[in-house]
Amino acid sequence: MRGMRFARPARIAAAGAALAATVSLLSTPQAGAAPICPDAGRAPVLVGRAPGAAIEGAAVDGAGRLYVTDLRSNRVLRIDRPGAPAVPFATVPGPMGGGLAFAPDGGLLVGYGDARVFVGDVARPAGIVKIDVGTGAVAPFASGLSAANGLAVTRDGTVYATNDLASLVGRVLPNGVVQPDWAVLPSANGAALSADDRYLYVSRTFVNPGVSRIPLANPAAPESLVDFGGADMFVAPDGLVLDALGRPIVPTDISGEILRVDGHNRYCALAGGLQGSSVLTFGSGGSGFSAGRLFRAGFDGDIYEIGA
């Protein structure tokens, strides 16, 4: 995985064994390669670059500006439009967790502090800060979480936070109460909410790789949508999104595919050849990284537009 050697050490250690096992698998033409989606669009187009960054999280504001988290510098970077330079926007305290999401009031939520993700379920060292996108001011938002690799926010302001290297999924209520053990799902990574706020969708990166959804009303009963097996066992799904039809679209760290889930254990590739893909985000607004467009960012610091 390009760029991974400088990224979060704990994650590299976990990914190392999977990557080594994958080398022989990927040497065969069909290994780890999903069928191409019949409606896949054009080939990926490079639209941005953050030189030297290892991007873990990405989100677009209403003005079409792209924000990304850099695991190497603990900074949030901003790219105002495709082709524009990535500029430092804010620095978070402690090690970068990577998750990014917008609160209902427009503030940018950023996960931090999960350098000890393997023991995060016990130590709960992670938290979330809130950034004013107008001024760049950083303020505390929540603490006491296992990790915050993925963040998702409901319409009422409830925040969900995942940990790709442990098991706890945390919840922060609108009144500020933190529930670090709201759900248990090993290696839950990324976070995306259904349009009706009934389900939290997550990738399972390192343990039983696949995609699950967790009913918000019954977090003890997660449902598996995809179980990657065979040659696909080592694809390492990461920060996913849902399309307009509610279908999960998942980037893969190792195989470099952008996969769309069309049904139970049915998936196809919208794009390939993008090793180190860590996160997807849809655009917003009428200009810049605009609404209706899908963007991929990765540990290589590159941002691509994906035909979807």
PLM feature spans:
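Glycine/small-residue-rich hydrophobic helix-like segments
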Residues: 209-274
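Beta-rich, blade/repeat-based domains predominating
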Residues: 48-65, 92-117, 125, 142-160, ...
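A short beta-strand motif characteristic of beta-propeller blades
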Residues: 42-49, 84-91, 136-142, 177-183, ...
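Short loop/turn segments that connect beta-strands within beta-propeller blades
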Residues: 79-84, 131-136, 172-177, 215-220, ...
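Secretory targeting and sorting signals
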Residues: 1-33
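Blade/loop signatures of beta-propeller domains
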Residues: 32-41, 73
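Beta-propeller domains
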Residues: 68-91
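A short loop-to-beta-strand structural motif that recurs across blades of beta-propeller domains
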Residues: 75-78, 126-129, 168-171, 210-212, ...
